[in-house]
Amino acid sequence: MFLLPRFVLVSCIIGSLGFDNPPTNVVSHLNGDWFLFGDSRSDCNHVVTTNPRNYSYMDLNPALCDSGKISSKAGNSIFRSFHFTDFYNYTGEGQQIIFYEGVNFTPYHAFKCTTSGSNDIWMQNKGLFYTQLYKNMAVYRSLTFVNVPYVYNGSAQSTALCKSGSLVLNNPAYIAREANFGDYYYKVEADFYLSGCDEYIVPLCIFNGKFLSNTKYYDDSQYYFNKDTGVIYGLNSTETITTGFDFNCHYLVLPSGNYLAISNELLLTVPTKAICLNKRKDFTPVQVVDSRWNNAMQSDNMTAVACQPPYCYFRNSTTNYVGVYDINHGDAGFTSILSGLLYDSPCFSQQGVFRYDNVSSVWPLYPYGRCPTAADINTPDVPICVYDPLPIILLGILLGVAVIIIVVLLLYFMVDNGTRLHDA
């Protein structure tokens, strides 16, 4: 029993001599069941096409290029592919999901639907989209895109109403006004179908303001009706502003089924693409690496806003992004963050990744995995080790009981042996 305090004391001395096990600013994984979604900074195929071939273009270690655990596309992002004609079919599956993308839709692109629109609304949309994506990928293994087929019984076609620069919105699709309608005060519908996935992320969007057309102002109104369950999802314009508004989107998580898209005023919108979520898993927080430009170009913090514990851990560099290939590709700080993908780690937390699961100087917040259960609390001069007392108390009780049993047995056999000798 006297060995236990000495063991604790020795452990404290070892800790004071240098073992610290702090959380590290990396993304990593518990085992080989992981997947990364990214852009040019992790697009090995894009590197192959550069002339000369130059891996300094990436923040990803090239040793991971043949891992089969990466879905990345130069110049793209999941949000960009979700809404616009500039499309890449991000596809991947894993227990532990990592995202390092988003920079290819920022204030630098200054997207807005109309000349009097607002890029701020689109940054808000981006934040809402990634919030939904991160939350759901904490409970789903598989992500991919699927097309959403729809049937509209009118003669009008979809129109590219919402576009800016090289970006053209095609999800949701706008159905143009029928030729026999003199204005936009009409009701119109279209059927769409979701099948083949466990759940889907789909957009439901409206112009939240007074939309002007030919001297008339319109209030947008859009609904999705699940014909199988009777559930209806809807948005109505509530703002009275006439300028500075844009396309406000909500991102719904819907089950498979037959749906009806309904517009009571202005143009009908209907989803054409969806994030396909498959294979439910035990809750596993996703990891997100900040995706931003060099300070010479304007970035946003929407992935940071979207990534909140307990479903998401956010990792960022403390310095400006300065690449070695060019200012926006090959930054040492972000390369260091991604270097954690080269090895397994036992514990993840809001503060970072722990390399060991025994003791640490920092109590992990929102821990996941096999995490340290003890911490070194350092006063200015004296290191004090603080352990979870319950295991120590229980161990002490068990040792005490064992000693008592041993003593009782020894006394029993000594008395019994003495009796036998006396009888002889």
UniProtKB/Swiss-Prot annotation:
<dbReference type="GO" id="GO:0019064">
    <property type="term" value="P:fusion of virus membrane with host plasma membrane"/>
</dbReference>
<dbReference type="GO" id="GO:0019031">
    <property type="term" value="C:viral envelope"/>
</dbReference>
<keyword id="KW-1133">Transmembrane helix</keyword>
<feature type="disulfide bond">
    <location>
        <begin position="113"/>
        <end position="162"/>
    </location>
</feature>
<feature type="disulfide bond">
    <location>
        <begin position="197"/>
        <end position="276"/>
    </location>
</feature>
<feature type="disulfide bond">
    <location>
        <begin position="205"/>
        <end position="249"/>
    </location>
</feature>
<keyword id="KW-0946">Virion</keyword>
<keyword id="KW-0325">Glycoprotein</keyword>
<dbReference type="InterPro" id="IPR007142">
    <property type="entry name" value="Hemagglutn-estrase_core"/>
</dbReference>
<feature type="disulfide bond">
    <location>
        <begin position="44"/>
        <end position="65"/>
    </location>
</feature>
<feature type="region of interest" description="Esterase domain 1">
    <location>
        <begin position="7"/>
        <end position="127"/>
    </location>
</feature>
<feature type="region of interest" description="Receptor binding">
    <location>
        <begin position="128"/>
        <end position="266"/>
    </location>
</feature>
<feature type="topological domain" description="Intravirion">
    <location>
        <begin position="414"/>
        <end position="424"/>
    </location>
</feature>
<feature type="active site" description="Charge relay system">
    <location>
        <position position="329"/>
    </location>
</feature>
<comment type="subunit">
    <text>Homodimer; disulfide-linked. Forms a complex with the M protein in the pre-Golgi. Associates then with S-M complex to form a ternary complex S-M-HE.</text>
</comment>
<keyword id="KW-0732">Signal</keyword>
<feature type="glycosylation site" description="N-linked (GlcNAc...) asparagine; by host">
    <location>
        <position position="54"/>
    </location>
</feature>
<dbReference type="GO" id="GO:0046789">
    <property type="term" value="F:host cell surface receptor binding"/>
</dbReference>
<feature type="glycosylation site" description="N-linked (GlcNAc...) asparagine; by host">
    <location>
        <position position="301"/>
    </location>
</feature>
<feature type="region of interest" description="Esterase domain 2">
    <location>
        <begin position="267"/>
        <end position="379"/>
    </location>
</feature>
<keyword id="KW-0472">Membrane</keyword>
<feature type="signal peptide">
    <location>
        <begin position="1"/>
        <end position="16"/>
    </location>
</feature>
<feature type="glycosylation site" description="N-linked (GlcNAc...) asparagine; by host">
    <location>
        <position position="417"/>
    </location>
</feature>
<dbReference type="GO" id="GO:0016020">
    <property type="term" value="C:membrane"/>
</dbReference>
<comment type="function">
    <text>Structural protein that makes short spikes at the surface of the virus. Contains receptor binding and receptor-destroying activities. Mediates de-O-acetylation of N-acetyl-4-O-acetylneuraminic acid, which is probably the receptor determinant recognized by the virus on the surface of erythrocytes and susceptible cells. This receptor-destroying activity is important for virus release as it probably helps preventing self-aggregation and ensures the efficient spread of the progeny virus from cell to cell.</text>
</comment>
<keyword id="KW-0378">Hydrolase</keyword>
<feature type="active site" description="Nucleophile">
    <location>
        <position position="40"/>
    </location>
</feature>
<feature type="active site" description="Charge relay system">
    <location>
        <position position="326"/>
    </location>
</feature>
<protein>
    <recommendedName>
        <fullName>Hemagglutinin-esterase</fullName>
        <ecNumber>3.1.1.53</ecNumber>
    </recommendedName>
</protein>
<feature type="topological domain" description="Virion surface">
    <location>
        <begin position="17"/>
        <end position="392"/>
    </location>
</feature>
<dbReference type="InterPro" id="IPR003860">
    <property type="entry name" value="Hemagglutn-estrase_hemagglutn"/>
</dbReference>
<feature type="glycosylation site" description="N-linked (GlcNAc...) asparagine; by host">
    <location>
        <position position="153"/>
    </location>
</feature>
<feature type="glycosylation site" description="N-linked (GlcNAc...) asparagine; by host">
    <location>
        <position position="89"/>
    </location>
</feature>
<feature type="disulfide bond">
    <location>
        <begin position="347"/>
        <end position="371"/>
    </location>
</feature>
<keyword id="KW-1043">Host membrane</keyword>
<dbReference type="Pfam" id="PF03996">
    <property type="entry name" value="Hema_esterase"/>
</dbReference>
<dbReference type="GO" id="GO:0106331">
    <property type="term" value="F:sialate 4-O-acetylesterase activity"/>
</dbReference>
<keyword id="KW-0812">Transmembrane</keyword>
<dbReference type="GO" id="GO:0106330">
    <property type="term" value="F:sialate 9-O-acetylesterase activity"/>
</dbReference>
<feature type="glycosylation site" description="N-linked (GlcNAc...) asparagine; by host">
    <location>
        <position position="236"/>
    </location>
</feature>
<comment type="similarity">
    <text>Belongs to the influenza type C/coronaviruses hemagglutinin-esterase family.</text>
</comment>
<feature type="glycosylation site" description="N-linked (GlcNAc...) asparagine; by host">
    <location>
        <position position="358"/>
    </location>
</feature>
